[in-house]
Structure formats: structure tokens, C-alpha cells
Amino acid sequence: MKEYPSVTVIGAGLAGSEAAWQIASAGIKVTLFEMRPKKKSPAHHSSEFAELVCSNSFGALSSDRAAGLLQEELRTLKSIVINKADKHSVPAGGALAVDRSQFSLSITNELSSHPLITIIRDECPSLPKTQQITILATGPLTSELLAEDIKEFTGEKECHFFDAASPIITGESIDFSTAFRASRYDKGDADYVNCPMNEDSYIKFHSELIKAEQAKLKDFEKESAHFFEGCLPIEQLAKRGIDTMRYGPLKPIGLWDPRWGDVNDKNIRRLKRAHAVVQLRQEDKAGQLWNLVGFQTNLKWGEQKRIFRMIPGLSKAEFIRFGVMHRNTYLESPKLIEPTLQFINRKTLFAAGQLTGTEGYAAAIAGGWLAGTNAALLAKGLDTITLPSSTMIGALTNFVSNSQASLRVKNKKNFQPMPANFGLLPELDNRVHNKRERYKEYRDRALGQIKKLRETLLDKSSYPTTI
């Protein structure tokens, strides 16, 4: 068996775990660095790989939705992380959500038992000084020492935003004389717990929320604190206006408790419908833990307990984990990396995951898949690949490696993180006016391209045929 150069992967989050698996599956030795548990981050709670620090949801499951298409592309390309997400999924309506503990543990066990993967549980304080093939997948919580070394290597000031996580409570502490099980518009099973608010309880809740005491930021964080729009703390959302939450995570539309009466009776519907609804999503297979959907927060823990217990049905809520906020670092990638995820000024160094400025779990996995695949090809002396911009993976990669496209999409002077969305894809050859039909056409085109790519990689023998 031919001996190929080994590859180093720094960081065992979603991107790093995926990258390490793809490389090892191609028959190449991998050294995987993970600083936890020796050095902890502000947001992680365990030492397991691919830990989900915010929501336990990967987004919409249907492949005619942007997040769902990205997941389906990864399934087609034999992603180990999406495979484990599917195996450890929990009921979440039309979304892919996972039991985060079982999910992370299964990935840790899979990588730890692979004969070609050597795991080093220590901080990697600097980039390799040689031309060793390396993937930088340290994520948004990159350690200070390594972040400084990256800054020196790139010559660019790092970018950042603030992200937050939602609280988790026990299911047995929910009062179901008020709360009820349902999915919006009764689609699928009744996977969510819903806590309805009337106008009076909503106004009181809003009033307390906007004046609640927040956890203090460090001085250097205060100077440039800004939030990612897709994950605003609930208190920041509330401060935008009395009804902002009702048109966001607390929207009541499509949610009805059968105990209120006949939903088809207009008079009953007018009298009984909720003014706002707080939803809870299942955290674990057993249904013992539930997270408050959209309740990312930076409130002090005592304030979280006091104010969130004002929600009808949660007056005796038992908190297993409080919401926290943390600083997320990312690169100004369009100035630094190519569509292959190689650095422009060092072809043996790759970047992957949220560090590159993609947003969302599946997008991080996609970056890990591409960086891992290309690192394996490079180690074998083969040409690296780029993905068509008509695929969601290719579109996201194009976004983080093409400055003009990035600035045009966001219409801002500064590069900002981007989640999967159909606005990144090129127009169809034939214009389709119906939005849902257009999204299906995008899906069919993308998956057709991904299947062709898979066959190409199989021909190169640089691709896992099984998981």
C-alpha cells in the first residue's frame, strides 16, 4: 500500500470531524488536534467532538428548502456527521434536530476508533511553519494564541460577532394544563410543546424582558459588540418593538390547542387564539429535556429563571442549562481563500467551517467535507476540486472565496457570515415564477451535479464508499 503524506486537522468540531473522516476514509493518516478538555471554551459543555453549542437543530429537513438541500447534498457525498445526525435525530416537525449528547458521543467514538486517525488532546497554539498539509477548523471559538498566529499569518484583522444559546428545561417541569403539544399548521406529528400567551401576559413579559439585567461583556468586547441577525438574543429582539417577538420566534399563527374549541369556528378562533406562543423543541431521545426555541439570551441566570418562568406553563420550570452568549471569530475569507478552501498564499493550508464565514451547522460540515476531500487529493498528488455554484455547497464556498459576490449579496462594506439560502444560487435557464416550484428546480439541478461529482471522486478512489 502506497504511503501518502499525513494531514493535520486543527479542531474537532463539526468541520474538523468531517474533514478528518473524509481524509482517513481516503486511506491517509490524520493527526486531529482538539484542545478540550485540557483547555475549555466559553460555550462548550463537554469534551466530545462536534458538540452543538447553540440549538440542536440543523434546520429544515425538506430538500426544497435551502438548509434541507444542503443536508441532502452532504448525504449524497457520504458525510459522516450528517449520517450521525440522521441516526440520532429527535422529533422536530419538519426540521432535523438531534439528541446532542448521543450525536457528539457517536462521532467521538467513530473518530477515536479509526486506525488512521491519531487524536491529540491539546491546544495547537500556532500554525505549522512547514508545508505540512493542514486544515484549520477551529471554529468561531478559536483560542487566543492560535487566533493571534492566524492574524499574523494573514495580515488581516479578525472579524467577529456575538452568538448566544437558549436555555434547556426538564419536560416534567412543564405545566400541560396550560401548555399543549402541536406542530405549526398540524404538519406532521405534534413535536413541539407550545406555551400560549394572551395579550396581557405578553405585555408583562415584554416589559420585564427589556429591562432585565444582562451579563456583563468584557471591555474589549463592549467596544465592538454586534450580533448575528440570524441568532439575536431574545432581549435584543424585544427592544426592537412590542410586537417584534410576535412576528418572530413567538408568532402564534398556525398553532391551536384543541381544548380551546373548534378551530374552524371563526368566533371561537377570534376569542380564543393566542396573542403569542413560546415553542419548546425536544433535546433528547427520551423527551426529558426541552429547549426554548429562539430564546438565545445574555441575561443573568437569575433573571432568566425569573422572567422565563413568567411564560404560561413554565412557572415551575427546572433549568438544566441557562442561555449564554459568546464571541464568535471568523476570517475575512474572500481576501484569503480560494474556492477549494486553500489559502491563496499557502496551498497546503486549508480553512473550513464557521471560521470561514459560513453560518449554520450543515454549512460548517460542508466546509469540512470539501477541505477534507481536497486535502486528501492534494496528499495523493491529484488536482483539488471546486463545486459548481449551482450546488448549495458550491454557492456557499463561492460566497466565502469571492469578495465581490460577498459584498454584493450582503450589500455591506464588511464581510458578514452567510447561511445557506437560495439567493446564492445562479438563476435557472428557464424562469419559474412559482417560488415552491422554482426551489424544487434548484434542488433537482443541484443534486444532479452532486451525483456527478460523487462518481468523479469514486473514479479517483479518494472517496468513502461506505460509512
Swiss-Prot record:
Is the keyword tRNA processing assigned to this protein? yes
Location, primary (coarse class): cytoplasm
Top-level EC class, please?
transferase
* GO cellular component entries: cytosol
EC number(s) recorded for this UniProt protein: 2.1.1.74
- Keyword line: Cytoplasm, FAD, Flavoprotein, Methyltransferase, NAD, NADP, Transferase, tRNA processing
Q: Name one GO molecular function term.
A: tRNA (uracil(54)-C5)-methyltransferase activity, 5,10-methylenetetrahydrofolate-dependent
Positions bound to FAD = 11-16
* GO terms (BP aspect): tRNA methylation; tRNA wobble uridine modification
Required cofactors, per record? Answer: FAD
The subcellular localization recorded is:
Cytoplasm
Q: Does the keyword tRNA processing apply?
A: yes
Residue stretches in coiled coil = none
Q: Quickly give the catalysed reaction.
A: uridine(54) in tRNA + (6R)-5,10-methylene-5,6,7,8-tetrahydrofolate + NADH + H(+) = 5-methyluridine(54) in tRNA + (6S)-5,6,7,8-tetrahydrofolate + NAD(+); uridine(54) in tRNA + (6R)-5,10-methylene-5,6,7,8-tetrahydrofolate + NADPH + H(+) = 5-methyluridine(54) in tRNA + (6S)-5,6,7,8-tetrahydrofolate + NADP(+)
**Pfam families per the UniProt record, alphabetical:** GIDA
Q: Which domain of life is it from?
A: Bacteria
Q: Which InterPro entries match?
A: FAD/NAD-bd_sf, MnmG-rel, MnmG_N, TrmFO
Q: Of which family is this protein a member?
A: Belongs to the MnmG family. TrmFO subfamily.
* HAMAP family attached to this UniProt entry: TrmFO (MF_01037)
Biological role: Catalyzes the folate-dependent formation of 5-methyl-uridine at position 54 (M-5-U54) in all tRNAs.
Q: In its UniProt entry, what is this protein called?
A: Methylenetetrahydrofolate--tRNA-(uracil-5-)-methyltransferase TrmFO
Name the species this protein comes from: Prochlorococcus marinus (strain NATL1A)
The gene behind this protein is trmFO
